[in-house]
Amino acid sequence: VIGGDECDINEHPFLAFMYYSPQYFCGMTLINQEWVLTAAHCDKTYMRIYLGIHTRSVANDDEVIRYPKEKFICPNKKKNVITDKDIMLIRLNRPVKNSTHIAPISLPSNPPSVGSVCRIMGWGAITTSEDTYPDVPHCANINLFNNTVCREAYNGLPAKTLCAGVLQGGIDTCGGDSGGPLICNGQFQGILSWGSDPCAEPRKPAFYTKVFDYLPWIQSIIAGNKTATCPP
């Protein structure tokens, strides 16, 4: 996260850290004791999922590591379009218990409204050159825009996405924040998918997969319908 500050250790009990290699990691969001949501483009063959984590180099007493037991990506996702249906649901190999630094966030009950102030968070780059990664998650507030702002910035926008950032630039998610949550008015509304390169450019908000539009798919999979398909 560019232009933010260290998150309060108590504000992100639902935030998980997916580690694949020193060069490749993502954010994830715990939605119940056994399931996390992230971006499909964060998928790797081998993933360690840390929950209850704040400082990467120092373990919290209640920090735990889990692995994917099952992974679900929309069966109708366009394979060669990284930004299409950029959402992945992962079942943990063992449930987690709620503790000081671990608690799920519920799925949104309403879609977010344009103009909302939203919170971003993650262990991603804190410099636009993407050469400085923090030991602790950084948090910042950004604004939810009308999708036309992103359409103009990127000559288009995938369906079922949210467009969020700061028009003057300087505050944004960045490399390593992918898959992490966009929290608007206390509700988990988005999953970081893609943004400008370099990050935090003026008039180039990032886009986030719109969780609300995928609720039927998420709820079907969790209920045991493993073949559920996503909206087109």
Swiss-Prot record:
GO terms for cellular component: extracellular region; secretory granule. Disulfide bonds join C7-C139, C26-C42, C74-C230, C118-C184, C150-C163, C174-C199. The keyword Protease applies. SMART domains: Tryp_SPc. Glycans are attached at N98, N146, N225. Expressed by the venom gland. Pfam families: Trypsin (PF00089). The lineage of its organism: Eukaryota, Metazoa, Chordata, Craniata, Vertebrata. InterPro entries: Peptidase_S1_PA, Peptidase_S1_PA_chymotrypsin, Peptidase_S1A, Trypsin_dom, TRYPSIN_HIS, TRYPSIN_SER. It is an enzyme of class 3 (hydrolase). The keyword Cell division does not apply. Inhibited by diisopropylfluorophosphate (DFP), but not by hirudin. Its main location: secreted. This is Thrombin-like enzyme bothrombin. SUPFAM superfamilies: Trypsin-like serine proteases (SSF50494). It is found in: Secreted. GO terms for biological process: proteolysis. The active site is at H41 (charge relay system), D86 (charge relay system), S178 (charge relay system). Optimum pH is 7.4-8.0 for the clotting activity. It catalyses: Selective cleavage of Arg-|-Xaa bond in fibrinogen, to form fibrin, and release fibrinopeptide A. The specificity of further degradation of fibrinogen varies with species origin of the enzyme.
